[in-house]
Amino acid sequence: IMGKDRTEFDPIVIAGGPCATFNPEPFADFIDAFIIGEGEGLVSHVLDIIRDGKLEGLDRHAILRQLADVSGVYVPSLYVPIYNEDGEFKGYDIVEGVPKTIKRHFEMLTSGGETVVATNYTEFGAMYIIEVARGCGRHCRFCMAGYCFRVPRVRPLDILKEGVERAEKLGKKVGLMGAAI
């Protein structure tokens, strides 16, 4: 169901991740709100806004309007594309009060970034994955990490050590993960 066809009884559809951050427009007609950038720190806030809005009796548009005020959230229905007569993209008709630019949300890497479900029934079942770093400063033209998540950030050593200790308690090998390691 396209976003414009959803009713008050339909869920608010949210998307995120690298593809949504890099180019959300191919999905804009189907998604109510995109989390642009890294979503771990935004998801609970976004869900709180939706829950609180529903509890207050706000309609779908009012909730989406509140989401648009969150830095790192893009609500496509509030940015209507405008085209020239020849079909060339001209710009957007932006709802008043909505940010003209959507800024990517970056995490400081102080929590999360580890295996959540530790089971042997997955591809890396014997391993406890720990994210060491995000972003990349090399800016290779072929790589999404260099453009989409440009700012290189390294998780603090004490947090990495805590992750290794959790892996040891579970009897798992440690796998280190990052875009540029």
What residue ranges belong to the model's regions?
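Radical SAM [4Fe-4S] cluster-binding motif and immediate context
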Residues: 110-181
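Glycine-rich beta-alpha loop elements in corrinoid/cobalamin-binding modules
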Residues: 1-94
